[in-house]
Curated annotation (Swiss-Prot):
Keywords: ATP synthesis, Cell inner membrane, Cell membrane, CF(0), Hydrogen ion transport, Ion transport, Membrane, Transmembrane, Transmembrane helix, Transport. This is ATP synthase subunit a. CDD domains: ATP-synt_Fo_a_6. The lineage of its organism: Bacteria, Pseudomonadati, Pseudomonadota, Gammaproteobacteria, Enterobacterales. GO terms for molecular function: proton-transporting ATP synthase activity, rotational mechanism. Its main location: membrane. The gene is atpB. It comes from Photorhabdus laumondii subsp. laumondii (strain DSM 15139 / CIP 105565 / TT01) (Photorhabdus luminescens subsp. laumondii).
Length: 274
């Protein structure tokens, strides 16, 4: 094979694995990834939606089953692991959230475990599920890491943003929240436009940074796995993929933890009365 042919094959391989399984909501037809068309507002990444929902259901099922069958005696391995996770999350909430709410701890647990499960999908062999999807179901493309899709991470961040607004208005009232936006940092009516711009940018930057941070790290990790699989011979891929997978375990756990911590911190800031 010529050098240009090898480059073309590697380019096609990498491009194929970066394509989502998309549904055009205007025609309700699957989008052909080879058509050269770009994604629009009316395009839905159904693979990201499918895997995120399935992993969310898996999380609820496993935790509910363990809670129902929990015993006060010697716990099993799964119950022990879940108790450790719940204790870790509960301690994190106690350290960072200083208000009183029965929602924050369950929310933090859901965010941490759900994001972690979606991140773990990046450890699967890069061709495993796409091969099954293509040869058994005729799917033109399939991406299995929901958090490597910016629409998923920003959707979760927008959910957190809605909670930030809710707790800000709940704790401070509409008047207090309005004063916070218009009379800080300069407490003078003449500076209301400047204050509004500064506080508005600060407020909007929270969901944007929250979503893009998770997306950027997971997209980069996924891309490295794809590059290893697409550019190296099969017999040498494990020399890089195995060490990277071991290191990536730390990354996916850390990113889930950071997303949870920032969620707690933002809600704690919103709940503080001034």
């Amino acid at each position: 094979m010529s050098a240009s042919g090898e480059v073309s094959t590697a380019r096609d391989y990498i491009g194929h694995h970066l394509n989502n399984l998309q549904l055009d909501l205007r025609t309700f037809e699957l989008v052909d990834p080879n058509s050269g068309g770009s994604a629009t507002f009316w395009t839905l990444n159904i693979d990201s939606l499918f895997f995120s929902v399935v992993l969310g259901i898996l999380f609820l099922y496993v935790f509910r089953k363990v809670a129902v069958n929990a015993t006060s005696g010697v716990p099993g391995k799964l119950q022990t692991a879940i108790e450790l996770i719940m204790g870790f999350v509960d301690n994190s909430v106690r350290d960072m959230y200083h208000g009183k709410s029965k929602v924050i701890a369950p929310l933090a647990l859901t965010v941490f475990v759900w994001v972690l499960l979606m991140n773990v999908m990046d450890l699967l062999p890069i061709d495993f599920l796409p091969y099954i999807g293509e040869h058994f179901f005729g799917l033109p493309a399939l991406r299995v890491v929901p958090t490597a899709d910016v629409s998923v991470t920003l959707s979760m961040a927008i959910g957190v943003f809605v909670l930030i607004l809710y707790y800000s208005i709940k704790m401070k009232g509409i008047g207090g929240f309005t004063k916070e936006l218009t009379l800080q940092p300069f407490n003078h009516p003449l500076f209301i436009p400047i204050n509004l711009i500064l506080e508005g940018v600060s407020l909007l930057s929270k969901p944007v940074s929250l979503g893009l941070r998770l997306f950027g790290n997971m997209y980069a990790g996924e891309l490295i796995f794809i590059l290893i699989a697409g550019l190296l011979p099969w017999w040498s891929q494990w020399l890089l993929s195995l060490p990277w997978a071991i290191f990536h375990i730390l990354i996916i756990t850390l990113q889930a933890f950071i997303f949870m911590v920032l969620t707690i911190v933002y809600l704690s800031m919103a709940s503080e009365e001034h």
